[in-house]
Amino acid sequence: MSRVASSRVLKDSNGDIGEHLRNHIHLTNCIHLKNHMHNNNKQSPVLTDRSLLMRDLVVLQRSRSLRDPSASPNLKEDHQDSREGRRRSGLRLSGSSPIVSFGTSKVTPSDEKFDRSSRKSYRVEEVNEVYSVPSVKSVSKDRINKKVNEAIVKTLSDQLNEVGGDSDDLVSCNVRPRGDGCRRRKFRGTRRAGRAVNVRDNAAGNESEMSIASNSVPRGEKYEGEEGGGGRDREQNMSCGIPFNWSRIHHRGKTFLDIAGRSLSCGISDSKGRKGEAGTPMFSDSSSSDREALPLLVDSADNEEWVHDYSGELGIFADNLLKNGKDSVIGKKSSRKNTRWHQSFTQKYAPRTFRDLLGQNLVVQALSNAIAKRRVGLLYVFHGPNGTGKTSCARVFARALNCHSTEQSKPCGVCSSCVSYDDGKNRYIREMGPVKSFDFENLLDKTNIRQQQKQQLVLIFDDCDTMSTDCWNTLSKIVDRAPRRVVFVLVCSSLDVLPHIIVSRCQKFFFPKLKDVDIIDSLQLIASKEEIDIDKDALKLVASRSDGSLRDAEMTLEQLSLLGTRISVPLVQEMVGLISDEKLVDLLDLALSADTVNTVKNLRIIMETGLEPLALMSQLATVITDILAGSYDFTKDQCKRKFFRRQPLSKEDMEKLKQALKTLSESEKQLRVSNDKLTWLTAALLQLAPDKQYLLPHSSSADASFNHTPLTDSDPSNHVVAGTRRDDSKQGFSCKNRPSVEDIWLAVIENVRVNGLREFLYKEGKIFSISIGSAPMVQLMFNSPIAKSTAENFEEHILKAFEAVLGSPVTLEMRTESKKDLGFSSLQGLSNGERFRESGRSEIVEVADSESPMTRVRRKHLEASQNQNQNQNQSIVRGKVSLAQVIKQAEGNSWSKHKAVEIANKLEQENLKLEPRSRSLICWKASRSTRRKLSRLKVRTRKLRLHSLLKLVSCGKCLSTRSPPR
């Protein structure tokens, strides 16, 4: 292609076509370089060796085949300019061009000849050469063809051998004008002290290869701008500036040349354009229509203020890329204004002044007074839980120390120091995160500030918990050598991790956990500013879950705000992984009601949500605590529950809750060390209310048939003993009118259809215990084995009577009254609801509201026998309430009540007559004197009346153990 172009140049007599073809030759060389660079980037995309790159660039500059022929000056005009003393300079090749290798270049002898002639005509001082192209008119076509056939091919290695000196000298190929008339010499590959201007690449290391080419700036342009404006204006000889394949490369998008920009200039531009450069217009890249009319390469280095502004089509993309690189790396203030980056609630509402610090009044007051009184220390340590404002307080403290405001409140936020800190440009406030080691010398240099400056250097060391021992040693040395105007602020969560040598020299400020009230107020303020629709109870839950950390509460609120709906308590519970209080109370109600099956089912449903067993146990304990404190509201689903159905809870229910809380706290220890946590949690819930269908009233009972039933505590809800009552909602008994055992027994007797059996059961039998539950069980006690065998013959009638009264099938068990049972039944003479423990026994019995007449008679005489030792001379009847009056006030059927009154009246008359004898007969522990008197008495024997008297009055214990002497 170069041969064809050369022949066409020779045919052109005027030189216009030749100038145009030289532009196309220049474009061909650029395309050639593009292909070579593309191939080399595939092999080694990372430019690792800078020195080799510089040497290649020097060779590229000196390669005559890569020069821009259109930039060559006209021979006649150049001679004329030389005589007029005009100064000229050429373009320089950028040192940051990413070209690694290029193809071979041919240097013809004719080029060398005309190069020597050009050196004679023009004197050049700089490292660069000003190349001249011979006139087209002075060369014939035959001579050109002959010289081309004799061309010598020089490879890159041959050209590199010709280049001597340091490759780092890629100073720039600048052309500096000299005012003196001495001979100007040409230096090849050598440095001249004080003449070269070093060009550095200012682009970031992580930029792309295209940005490397576009960010290089020729520094020597300022010399040309100072001296190039004193001549006459000349027209720029850029020809048409449109390549031959413009229509193809223009519409396919950005090419390599568009991306590389003007810094990849592969030749020497026209030196004629150097004259009158001040009048060269600056092209804009605002519209596509403007860019279509721009020339390919235009030198814009004449204005020193536009150092990075390259005119022409190839430099437009480079300008945009350079601007984008600056905004991304440096972060200009203008880019921050135009681009609105998202800030979290923690960053957006971070404290700016001491008044913004929440819940740290003592710390704020102490630091404010220290600044106002100028009593600032050297070392401060802020310690406390996370999210309490330690780092924020350190930043506010640092701003206040450097604030220029003369008012009392600092920081002001409007002075130069505060504004520079907000922009991230304050060099007197340094924050250092957790690092493995410190650069001792570098950090010490930062602390060395000028004494005449009023600013104080504040070094904030955040998260000191993770600092190593070497860091502490280095910090200790820095503190020893630091000047007075340096303040160190250490931020950590605990003082235990800090060395003692540091802690002993610090002013320590503790940041406690924030109160829920303060956190709720702050969250309400944020919610109102951000227009978040949230319930107050939900805010309370968020604050309670934050554990005194405002930062955690703000992050939780920000997450909830992303849902886009009204924030309620169930939504917060689901978000943070909690179970609703209603579900917890339902589970607790089932566990306390001994509903084993539903308890296990509900527990499995809750655990399927992914909740940890420890967390569930902790929530259950929290709910129990709220119920005991009276702060829980049972307004919802109260009718569906069993244990919590009655409100307010009784004392017995409160005791059960306390026992349940104790059980959960003890089970938590096992739960932490166990691998199967769900099993332990299930066992703990089932222990809250074990199965209590059966009752053992006597732990020392000799009957082995009751050993299979579990012992019970003081809960009488499912068990009724002789003389007790029971509240059973399943049977329809209300709390106010629950039947007693005597009422049940009388109702059973009335339902017996055999008349003789009725009287027999009333005289010989009684209910010993009854259990009403899923499988009701009744135990009947008879006075003798004969009576028991007689009742067994009528067992079917008795079962039907019990089923009619209780409304369900009953398991009936009969037994004979023993001596212990007789003593037990004699102890049931207390008032309603009371319990007592007999001496030498461990039975606890609950007494019914009303007693039968026979029971009252026995209780009356039992009390008299117990008081005999205290006052033996006191009469049994005198000074006490009449038995007839007591029986009249007793509850019961009218027929039995009337009969009991008659018996009581007769009994009182007999007691008045036989008072001394009854005293010794009732209790065998009477004194000897009383027994002697009784032996001398003449008693008329009446066996029948005495037998009836002993049957009704005597306790049975004294007569069975010891008979009185006669």
UniProtKB/Swiss-Prot annotation:
Coiled-coil regions listed: 650-678
Protein name, entry field: Protein STICHEL-like 4
One BP annotation, GO: DNA replication
Signal peptide coordinates: none
Keyword Zinc (UniProt): yes
High-level lineage: Eukaryota, Viridiplantae, Streptophyta, Embryophyta, Tracheophyta
UniProt keyword terms in alphabetical order: ATP-binding, Coiled coil, Metal-binding, Nucleotide-binding, Zinc
Compositional bias (Basic and acidic residues): 75-84, 109-118, 219-236
Binding site for ATP: G384, P385, N386, G387, T388, G389, K390, T391
Family indicated by similarity: Belongs to the DnaX/STICHEL family.
Presence of keyword Ion transport: no
GO CC entries: DNA polymerase III complex
Residues covered by region (Disordered): 64-118, 200-237, 706-733
InterPro entries per the UniProt record, alphabetical: AAA+_ATPase, DNA_pol3_clamp-load_cplx_C, DNA_pol_III_gamma-3, DNA_pol_III_sug/sutau_N, DNA_Rep/Repair_Clamp_Loader, DnaA_N-like_STI, HLD_clamp_pol_III_gamma_tau, P-loop_NTPase
Molecular function, one GO term: metal ion binding
Residues that, per the record, bind Zn(2+): C403, C412, C415, C418
